[in-house]
Amino acid sequence: MTSIRVLGSAAGGGFPQWNCNCHNCDGVRRGTVRATPRTQSSIALTGDGPDAILVNASPDILQQLRQAPALQPARAPRDTAIAAVVLMDAQIDHVTGLLMLREHREALPLYATAAVLDDLGAAFPLTRILSHYCGLRTHALPCDGTAFSVPPLDGLTLTAIPLESKAPPYSPNRHAPRAGDNIGLRIEDRRSGRSAFYAPGLGRIDDHVFAELHSADIVLVDGTFWRDDEMQAPGFSGKSAADMGHLALSGPGGMIEVLERLPASRKILIHINNTNPVLVEDSPERAELARHGIEVAYDGMEIAL
């Protein structure tokens, strides 16, 4: 049986964010709000054996692995369950964890689109840096709907679904989008036939993305911001949620309305920004999600597929 383990459920910076004193961050530090700290988003896919696919390598990966003993099978003096890494994009909070995995015993298999590999080869040259350590064995993911598998987890079929979003701020293509800058991931269990759709960064939901969401048994999607002006209103940033490539949860056409139209048995939000009021467990916003049957991911959450 395929299982999705949420290693990290927060957006970039984690929760609480190191330099933030918003209501949520200050409250969780002081213990004055009902909220649980979270690390930066990443998941692990496992099957019946000990091996796992790491999807996105968070800067918090070492802490996340310590909190997931099953990902250290201890079959040898140096060991890990991580058989390969799949990247959804080249964002800082999704790739810098690769540096923490540099002691891997051999070249680490890395699956990413050509656009992401291009950014990691030049603008943020992780592939060149890691060539002096374990090295990376890169595999370019197709963006045409062709399914692929990652050995030794051959019971899983994965498909990269191009999304309309933005390349990282450091990328020379930030304002010249390419297919594959950001993907969603269709995850299918060959034995059960069940599927999940994972997309921690969703800026716009067009017809083909909605079709993916609608066909999935489980959706694990972008819950970054509650409001489009969430960063602007308190003066944290001049950018809206849409400017940063995220569809806000509330409001007309927001993620709540999208999820309301889906038949999925579980609808789960991930990549939650530290400012998002849904992090407070007794907030009106969290209650609204519950009324719509929407869950909020947390570190250590296990999702059976």
UniProtKB/Swiss-Prot annotation:
InterPro entries found in the cross-reference section: Metallo-B-lactamas (IPR001279), PQQ_synth_PqqB (IPR011842), RibonucZ/Hydroxyglut_hydro (IPR036866)
CDD domains found in the cross-reference section: PQQB-like_MBL-fold
Keywords linked to the UniProt accession: PQQ biosynthesis, Transport
GO biological process: pyrroloquinoline quinone biosynthetic process
SUPFAM superfamilies: Metallo-hydrolase/oxidoreductase (SSF56281)
Pathway(s) annotated for this protein in UniProt: Cofactor biosynthesis; pyrroloquinoline quinone biosynthesis
One Pfam family matching this protein: Lactamase_B_2
Homology family: Belongs to the PqqB family.
NCBIfam families named among the record's database cross-references: PQQ_syn_pqqB
Function description: May be involved in the transport of PQQ or its precursor to the periplasm.
PANTHER family per record: COENZYME PQQ SYNTHESIS PROTEIN B, HYDROLASE C777.06C-RELATED-RELATED
Name of the protein: Coenzyme PQQ synthesis protein B
Protein source organism: Cupriavidus necator (strain ATCC 17699 / DSM 428 / KCTC 22496 / NCIMB 10442 / H16 / Stanier 337)
Gene that encodes it: pqqB
